[in-house]
């Protein structure tokens, strides 16, 4: 999946929203406080509402420019990257990419089919999330 979106908010604001969300998720999973400076390279286990578990690894962070994490389950590995480009003092462009690597040929085939069918839905949802973040900027 690949999506680029111009937002009416500074790059620093959107970056901080992404990091705050990540820190909230991490702190809920490990039951202790973690600062933004500590998240690069951090790994933790997350249990989803469905009961499935995944290991989340914060791969890279570059202040106001990049946030990348890897989600690993028993059958798939997702790498999600948010690149933030400052366009002006009150506008930025966010490019989100997600790659999926499945373990096994049948899963890879299934991912190709479902990705083609459901990819638009995922992009639509991501647009809503990014727009909601930008809407909180004043």
PLM features: what roles do these ranges have?
Residues 1-2, 51-56, 77-81:
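Short, surface-exposed coil-to-beta transition loops
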Residues 8-12, 59-64, 83-93, 137-138:
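A short, structured loop/turn motif at beta-sheet edges
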Residues 74-124:
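Beta-strand/loop substructures that line and gate deep hydrophobic ligand-binding cavities in soluble
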Residues 31-36, 130-138:
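Short, highly charged C-terminal tails/helix-capping segments
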């Amino acid at each position: 999946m690949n999506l680029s979106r111009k937002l009416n908010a500074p790059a620093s604001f959107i970056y901080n929203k992404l990091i705050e969300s990540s820190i909230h998720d991490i702190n809920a999973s490990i039951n202790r406080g973690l600062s933004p400076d500590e998240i690069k390279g951090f790994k933790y286990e997350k249990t989803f509402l469905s009961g499935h578990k995944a290991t989340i690894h914060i791969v890279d962070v570059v202040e106001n420019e990049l946030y990348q994490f890897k989600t690993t389950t028993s059958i798939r590995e997702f790498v999600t990257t948010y690149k933030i480009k400052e366009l002006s003092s009150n506008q930025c462009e966010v490019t989100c990419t997600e790659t999926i690597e499945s373990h096994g040929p049948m899963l890879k085939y299934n991912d190709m089919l479902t990705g083609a069918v459901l990819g638009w839905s995922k992009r639509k949802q991501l647009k809503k999330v990014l727009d909601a973040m930008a809407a909180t900027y004043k």
